[in-house]
Amino acid sequence: MAISGETIDYGPCAFMDFYNPKTVFSSIDKLGRYSFSNQPPITKWNLARLAECLIPLIHQNEDPAIKIATETIDNFQSIYEKKWLNMMRDKLGLFGKDKNDLKLINDLLHWMELNKADYTNTFCHLMNINFNNESKYKVMSFLNWFKQWQNRVLTNNGSVEKSINLMKKNNPTVIPRNHKVEEAIEAANNNDLSLTNKLLSILNKPYDNQNNIENYQSPSKNDEYQTFCGT
């Protein structure tokens, strides 16, 4: 992690289809150090390493410099939790704040994990983009949560229409599905860039409700997608 806020190491990485907080994409990450759920603490760890490099610039004496850096890094968790909660409220089209918001969000994530629901497509379903009409969204466990969500949407002068408009600004309808990226790479290696150009054209408008892109919205049929690290 650089002081500019940019990330430098981009691989191995991939996009998560079915929601699983333990998802990893590196063949050597056996303990889940870089799993989806471990991104916040590993980000804090990276920031701590960055702070170590800045110690000589923070204070002329090392001890007070370390104290300042430590206190600053310790603020990360509370800042992250607040930002994450606000982000998830936007993804669910929730205006204002409610004491039960965190539970509502975590209940949905837990349901996704238990039912192997696609992360991106679940939010699309809530936005009434029913491109696949999966039966899992008709089960009672989801419908019970859905009713709670609808009741929350109508609070704080909200409406379904206003909520969906907010959701459309915060939820992509299409992401670079790993299997589609692999297809494009394989074709490009055989001097065929048509799949690459098509994929880039679709991904250039991730928040639009585009026509005839269902094939790019479907998760891979494989249970696992693994990338490899050369280190």
Give the residues covered by each predicted segment.
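Flexible glycine/proline-rich, aromatic-decorated loop/lid segments
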Residues: 9-28
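Hydrophobic residue at the +6 position relative to the catalytic HRD Asp in the kinase catalytic loop
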Residues: 1-3
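Regulatory N- and C-terminal appendages and interdomain linkers associated
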Residues: 30-231
